[in-house]
Curated annotation (Swiss-Prot):
It is an enzyme of class 3 (hydrolase). Keywords: Amino-acid biosynthesis, Hydrolase, Methionine biosynthesis. PANTHER family: 5'-METHYLTHIOADENOSINE/S-ADENOSYLHOMOCYSTEINE NUCLEOSIDASE, 5'-METHYLTHIOADENOSINE_S-ADENOSYLHOMOCYSTEINE NUCLEOSIDASE. It catalyses: S-adenosyl-L-homocysteine + H2O = S-(5-deoxy-D-ribos-5-yl)-L-homocysteine + adenine; S-methyl-5'-thioadenosine + H2O = 5-(methylsulfanyl)-D-ribose + adenine; 5'-deoxyadenosine + H2O = 5-deoxy-D-ribose + adenine. Catalyzes the irreversible cleavage of the glycosidic bond in both 5'-methylthioadenosine (MTA) and S-adenosylhomocysteine (SAH/AdoHcy) to adenine and the corresponding thioribose, 5'-methylthioribose and S-ribosylhomocysteine, respectively. Also cleaves 5'-deoxyadenosine, a toxic by-product of radical S-adenosylmethionine (SAM) enzymes, into 5-deoxyribose and adenine. Thus, is required for in vivo function of the radical SAM enzymes biotin synthase and lipoic acid synthase, that are inhibited by 5'-deoxyadenosine accumulation. GO terms for molecular function: adenosylhomocysteine nucleosidase activity; methylthioadenosine nucleosidase activity. The lineage of its organism: Bacteria, Pseudomonadati, Pseudomonadota, Gammaproteobacteria, Enterobacterales. This is 5'-methylthioadenosine/S-adenosylhomocysteine nucleosidase. Substrate binds at residues 78, 152, 173-174. The active site is at residues 12, 197.
């Protein structure tokens, strides 16, 4: 099995990258892909860049060039569920765009023409992630993750997301674009991110302060998940 891992920022991939043996670097389309073995398992780690276009471009290049069997999207996210705090884990059961609106033509809010309203994560990957969470004794929430090209740190943006997606557990800027590409390629995916901030008016301050905490937690989760997927 070859496992594809996608993170947007240097801070979100550096700990994992340092653990890859026999590492080689591929630069394509402004993205960097690091291939090798993570604890004996073949991996391809993508640093995509921030935002939906960068994530979709990177995911496409990763899938075409490295042919992974599954995709794990890792990194940080803003917490929406009331039980979440910095360092906690969110696992996707679905991903949707929070900034797409073609409802004038009868589509659901967040749905693009020719696409489902949401992109479902793979049940087996979800189950494996939840098993890792129990083993590591981490606090985690599974649910809807929403994505858009905006960092949410104000009451207006937050209120709009809560109104349109009352069940969303986290918000970030890449996951749904990655899920969209995986849907088109028919490749299983799951989003496993750590909370770096609570999506409120001070989130930009807590994000800078706690990004390292989120990166450490998400790296721990992904490393454990890779082991479980490879060896059961």
């Amino acid at each position: 099995m070859k496992i594809g891992i996608i993170g947007a920022m240097e801070e979100e991939v550096t700990l994992l990258r340092d653990k890859i043996d026999n590492r080689q670097t591929i630069t394509l389309g402004g993205c960097e892909i690091y291939t090798g073995q993570l604890n004996g398992t073949e991996v391809a780690l993508l640093k995509s860049g921030i935002g939906k276009v960068a994530a979709a471009l990177g995911a496409t290049l990763l899938l075409e060039h490295c042919k992974p069997d599954v995709i794990i999207n890792t990194g940080s996210a803003g917490g929406l569920a009331s039980t979440l705090k910095v360092g906690d884990i969110v696992v996707s059961d679905e991903a949707r765009y929070h900034d797409a609106d073609v409802t004038a033509f009868g589509y659901e809010y967040g749905q693009l023409p020719g696409c489902p309203a949401g992109f479902k994560a793979d049940d087996k990957l979800i189950a494996a992630a939840e098993s890792c969470i129990r083993e590591l004794n981490l606090n985690a929430v599974r649910g809807l993750i929403v994505s858009g090209d905006a960092f949410i740190n104000g009451s207006v943006g937050l209120a709009k997301i809560r109104h349109n997606f009352p069940d969303a557990v986290a918000v970030e800027m890449e996951a749904t674009a990655i899920a969209h590409v995986c849907y088109n390629f028919n490749v299983p995916f799951v989003v496993v991110r750590a909370i770096s901030d609570v999506a409120d008016q001070q989130s930009h301050l807590s994000f800078d302060e706690f990004l390292a905490v989120a990166a450490k937690q998400s790296t721990l989760m992904v490393e454990t998940l890779v082991q479980k997927l490879a060896h059961g």
